[in-house]
């Protein structure tokens, strides 16, 4: 991965965010955040009062009112700055993607074949269904499917990965992305989208903050904050007539300051930034989420469906042993296995040749000198091999070799059946070798479980997340690998229909399911899953069915996606806890100061020993503004994540952010009060 990572407080982003924070003072922007809109109205009201007092139109301290007004404006500006910083990071990422888009001409074919006549047209004029020809050095003008040819493609502009990939017609590697470059050969591509709907266009729209919609949890929290704000607004509004009736009317400036300190301005000012930053962190992991809803769902996931190959195991099965049938020498089996693999360029085939060389010093032989014919593997026969004179050597799956042997008049030995079961039980894949109608024995192919994966699954289990391994292996092999890897369950001999049924079963139990996929056959299950991470190297159908795309095409990334989702939810919950606890502490500063003249008994609540009512109120307002600034890095970066159970996580957050939220204001407000007093400002 070579994509450049932005510093948390990039100087250029900070400068732009400061300008954007001022622009966001517009009431057309402020009303979208009801909590901060109340602060904005209070700032405007106190500003007008300060001007009126300075001009003699109203009685009261113009200096005190102006000071409160200035810090209320700072409160709004700091909240705007937090949101602008988060949006700025997303826009910077989007701008880097926009740089990939290039104005180009396309060779539009008049017929869907390589040698058809071409028309040179601007790429933006292409429509869904059009067929284009691209050759070495060309920029692919549209998203589409390869219908003819094969080529090496540089996708670094999209993925950040410098290694080229192969794209060819047929199979799961036929999908191409507009904006990538052909390095060699040629492709005939059928466009699958219209201009403005390409994967690159969708990526840009996804990461730009302006396109972000609030998630369900964010909406629910916003409603709670609005409800609290309305309660405190009504409570504050009723104080003025009561205090006026008692003969000691509380000033409007004090009431505005009281209201701002009572309502949850800290989380209200940071809520939008947390959501935008969550999507930005997901992009930092090279995963594109279609919406904040997808990121949020990742944090709530409690079932992970994980492909065995590449996710749980290394995915490159290696020959580990030769197990001869009764009456067959191991060297004879190794010689036949090596001969059948001489032209097999798969990792498994090469490992068989190497193992035979290591065990019996059997050197590679040249097929031409042997006058041999290689028989390639096909999905229909499920075996491969070699024909040398009268010898017919085959290797393949148990069922395929059984049919082959019986078709040639032989029989499948019972002792080999037992060996097959034993190999599968140990978590290896049995590959049977036969010569003519005679079964020679088994090659055991071992797929290595990734180091540390068992510990990661144990952490997920602590968090209440169930892990399910998906594999095409038989049940015995699947059970052995599942036990070695430490997953909670497995689905063996998996088919697309079985995956879909399993997802629906878990969802019917009220669980949220996450999975990865890359093929067209994965599309139904991806569309059904709550969090569906499609591989960028996969088919167009898979990418359209998923709600996230992993640009690195790494199936293990699903675990990281869940961690990022949980971190976003934890950040929102932690800062909400801190904000509400903050408000409780601020009551002890501002309520005695505001009402001591009306109700002298409240003086006993001045536990901080603040200098005067004016210094107490101003200190609380200043602290209320500054705490937003101090929490901006936490909102952008996210709270530190630890894989704990829900109850342990709740206890930890209550101690850190609940108790911290209570104590920090006492220290902060007292320190500000001392500074104001020593400087003679109050």
UniProtKB/Swiss-Prot annotation:
It is found in: Cell inner membrane. Keywords: ATP-binding, Cell inner membrane, Cell membrane, Ion transport, Magnesium, Membrane, Metal-binding, Nucleotide-binding, Phosphoprotein, Potassium, Potassium transport, Translocase, Transmembrane, Transmembrane helix, Transport. The active site is at 307 (4-aspartylphosphate intermediate). One of its GO terms (molecular function) is P-type potassium transmembrane transporter activity. It comes from Klebsiella pneumoniae subsp. pneumoniae (strain ATCC 700721 / MGH 78578). This is Potassium-transporting ATPase ATP-binding subunit. It is an enzyme of class 7 (translocase). The keyword Nucleotide-binding applies. The keyword Membrane applies. Belongs to the cation transport ATPase (P-type) (TC 3.A.3) family. Type IA subfamily. The system is composed of three essential subunits: KdpA, KdpB and KdpC. Signal peptide: none annotated. The chain crosses the membrane at residues 35-55, 62-82, 219-239, 254-274, 588-608, 616-636, 656-676. It catalyses: K(+)(out) + ATP + H2O = K(+)(in) + ADP + phosphate + H(+).
